Amino acid sequence: SGDFNYYDSIEKLSKGLIEYQIQNENDTLNGMYFCWGNTWHNWGNNQANGLIEAYEVTADSSILSSVQLWANSFVPFVIENNFPWEISVSSTNHFEMVSVPQIAYGLGSIYKGLKSLSVVNENDSYKQLSEDVFKWFKGNNIAQMVMYDNETGRCFDGIDGPSKINRNSGAESTIECLLAIQSRKG
């Protein structure tokens, strides 16, 4: 008949994402969502933002708790470790980080998740954490370079090393940065 229970689908997808999250307070990577296999990567890690959108539809507190765990535990780890590109976990729970490249799309994803959480939760600490992530665009990054140009509106694609900027400014990078700027004002 064409009826579709999207609430059920949202719940199932949300539970699936949460199952791919480390939930162990004794684990350094507590709160991390795996993106692929045994790996988290900076590129498009939109689980938190997607889960917040799911929470707004379902009001399922387990979804909100999952994103709060990510924000309280994993995001500070990412910030302290200068926004790594990738984290891979071995079968013995040892992990390795790859520091670069760092891309605007990756930082924008973390920022959006935190910003959405701060709005839903009305919590200033999450808003401040989102601002700590946004500072990457303003030069608080491993290259110590401002990534966004106020005069032209462009954003550089990313960072390829401690002092090496990818000065391309493709649509994806610029849009991610501009969306982050726009949501800061909201």
Residue positions per predicted region:
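Glycan-recognition and catalytic cores of secretory/periplasmic carbohydrate-active enzymes
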Residues: S1-G186
